[in-house]
């Protein structure tokens, strides 16, 4: 019949297309879908494709004014999740025309927007995205990347060492700067503002920036090494954030910091552009990520947030520790660590990687291991993360019984010992404790640290684990 046929029709009639062959320019998404009882997986998968692209709940007259075939998302493959009675991985392909160039904000508004509140689904989780090279080329990405950062810092062949200044809230700017100086003088490469530190009554941002810059230059002069402190530019408005970044540049410091999820992708991308134009490195903290990524059946996996950050821009990002106090299983963590650092990553379901991803010319991001780690973890961290990483010890530096500078010395000695042992061909996983003990014989600072933390472990099973093999 000619003309418009009003009414409601099943999504799967339009949006479930198992015969579809994906294009190189499509954005591909893997969703973990838990349909409501009685809703077939084809209908649920098609509903996800529809609601995150061109569809709405009823047919509309204006559908006839455009080519739905050109613009609609398509659910092209569904597979049951092994070991789960009512979960399916639904693969959806989106035509590239649906997205604004260079906008992570727009990409997420579509793909993880209203569809997550959809009644026909009990739960929905975005497991992975394949970003086509054509879309990647519309993003600047990280301001500098791994190689440029090493060249700026003149540090090669080892992981970098950091420390989050604690107590995270309550110090005056002067005392805060003192702690920064002691840690950097003791041998760390970086110190860090805690993510909660913005500009509170006890320490306004400008005072903190000044005292930290002074600490940094003093430590640089005494050690002959380039030092950095992540000055947190996160603020209540984009304008205020940029004002803080400009002041950091005027002070001549090497690096600023942003909380990219609470600050938002629009603000983050603006800041990343400023950092590239003005030679600032950009450290990214992922505060709020666990709200989005910790539940296994709903939300968004961190590997998607990591990909989005590489597009939006950042030179460092927190990526879990595998061995510390915060969530992160080894295979999954290494999966998205490689996604951050490498140019090309093959599909590998054993590490939770659903798609092959080619980053073309986008620089890499350095993963930061931080949270409940100390000197006994150093061999494992060196082995797991390799050279292109930042290992951050907050309490593991400042909790040293002799103070901050000896805490920094202990970490630097432990790191150098692990790197030396690895370069000599020793097995860090098997001999880690022995390597640390040997080094502590000639470093009293390390010996004291070893004594304090010899029994500390955070042994809980990860919540977000890989699915069993079929």
UniProtKB/Swiss-Prot annotation:
Residue numbers of N6,N6,N6-trimethyllysine PTMs: 5
PTM text: The disulfide bond which can form in the large chain dimeric partners within the hexadecamer appears to be associated with oxidative stress and protein turnover.
Its job: RuBisCO catalyzes two reactions: the carboxylation of D-ribulose 1,5-bisphosphate, the primary event in carbon dioxide fixation, as well as the oxidative fragmentation of the pentose substrate in the photorespiration process. Both reactions occur simultaneously and in competition at the same active site.
Annotated signal sequence range: none
Catalytic activity: 2 (2R)-3-phosphoglycerate + 2 H(+) = D-ribulose 1,5-bisphosphate + CO2 + H2O; D-ribulose 1,5-bisphosphate + O2 = 2-phosphoglycolate + (2R)-3-phosphoglycerate + 2 H(+)
Cofactor(s) it depends on: Mg(2+)
Intracellular or extracellular location(s): Plastid, Chloroplast
Record's miscellaneous remark: The basic functional RuBisCO is composed of a large chain homodimer in a 'head-to-tail' conformation. In form I RuBisCO this homodimer is arranged in a barrel-like tetramer with the small subunits forming a tetrameric 'cap' on each end of the 'barrel'.
Highest taxon in the source lineage: Eukaryota
Keyword terms: Calvin cycle, Carbon dioxide fixation, Chloroplast, Disulfide bond, Lyase, Magnesium, Metal-binding, Methylation, Monooxygenase, Oxidoreductase, Photorespiration, Photosynthesis, Plastid
Record: residues binding substrate: 114, 164, 168, 286, 318, 370
Cofactor remark: Binds 1 Mg(2+) ion per subunit.
Binding site for Mg(2+): 192, 194-195
InterPro entries documented for this protein: RuBisCO, RuBisCo_large_chain_AS, RuBisCO_lsu_C, RuBisCO_lsu_C_sf, RuBisCO_lsu_fd_N, RuBisCO_lsu_N_sf, RuBisCO_lsuI
Enzyme class: lyase
Active site: 166 (proton acceptor), 285 (proton acceptor)
GO cellular component, one term: chloroplast
Designated name of the protein: Ribulose bisphosphate carboxylase large chain
Protein's gene: rbcL
E.C. no: 4.1.1.39
Metal-binding in keyword set: yes
Sites bearing N6-carboxylysine, chain numbering: 192
Sites annotated Transition state stabilizer: 325
């Amino acid at each position: 019949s000619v003309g418009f046929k009003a009414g409601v029709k099943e999504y799967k009639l339009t949006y479930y297309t198992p015969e579809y062959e994906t294009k190189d320019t499509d954005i591909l998404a893997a969703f973990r879908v838990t349909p409501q009882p009685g809703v077939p997986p084809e209908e649920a998968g098609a509903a996800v494709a529809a609601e995150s692209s061109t569809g709405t709940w009823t047919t509309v007259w204006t559908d006839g004014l455009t080519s739905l075939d050109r613009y609609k998302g398509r659910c092209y493959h569904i597979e049951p999740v092994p070991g789960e009675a009512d979960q399916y991985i639904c693969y959806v392909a989106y035509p590239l025309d649906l997205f604004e160039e260079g906008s992570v904000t727009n990409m997420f508004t579509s793909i993880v927007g209203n569809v997550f509140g959809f009644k026909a689904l009990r739960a929905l989780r975005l497991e992975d995205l394949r970003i086509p090279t054509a879309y990647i080329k519309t993003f600047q990405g990280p301001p500098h990347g791994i190689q440029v950062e090493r060249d700026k810092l003149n540090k090669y062949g080892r992981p970098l060492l950091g420390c989050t200044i604690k107590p995270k809230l309550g110090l005056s700017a002067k005392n805060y700067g003192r702690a920064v100086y002691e840690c950097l003088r003791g041998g760390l490469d970086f110190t860090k503002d805690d993510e909660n530190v913005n500009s509170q009554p006890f320490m306004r941002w400008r005072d903190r920036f000044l005292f930290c810059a002074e600490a940094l230059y003093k430590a640089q002069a005494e050690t002959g090494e380039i030092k950095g402190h992540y000055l947190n530019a996160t603020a209540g408005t984009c304008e205020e954030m940029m004002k803080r970044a400009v002041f950091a540049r005027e002070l001549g410091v090497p690096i600023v910091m942003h909380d990219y999820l609470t600050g938002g992708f629009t603000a983050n991308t603006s800041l990343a552009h400023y950092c590239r134009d003005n030679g600032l490195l950009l450290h990214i903290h992922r505060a709020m990520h666990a709200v989005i990524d910790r539940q296994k059946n709903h939300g968004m996996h961190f590997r998607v947030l990591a990909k989005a950050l590489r597009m939006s821009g950042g030179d460092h990002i927190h990526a879990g520790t595998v061995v510390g106090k915060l969530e992160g299983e080894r295979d999954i963590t290494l999966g998205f660590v490689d996604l951050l650092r490498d140019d090309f990553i093959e599909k590998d379901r054993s590490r939770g990687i659903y798609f092959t991803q080619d980053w073309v010319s986008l620089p890499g991001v350095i993963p930061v291991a931080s949270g409940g780690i100390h000197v006994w973890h150093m061999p494992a961290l060196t082995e797991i993360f390799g050279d292109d990483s930042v290992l951050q010890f907050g309490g593991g530096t400042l909790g040293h019984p002799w103070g901050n500078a000896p805490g920094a010395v202990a970490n630097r000695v432990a790191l150098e010992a692990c790197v030396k042992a690895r370069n000599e061909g020793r097995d860090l996983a098997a001999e880690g404790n022995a390597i640390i003990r040997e080094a502590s014989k000639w470093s009293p600072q390390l010996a004291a640290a070893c004594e304090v933390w010899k029994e500390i472990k955070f042994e809980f099973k990860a919540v977000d684990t890989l699915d069993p093999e079929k």
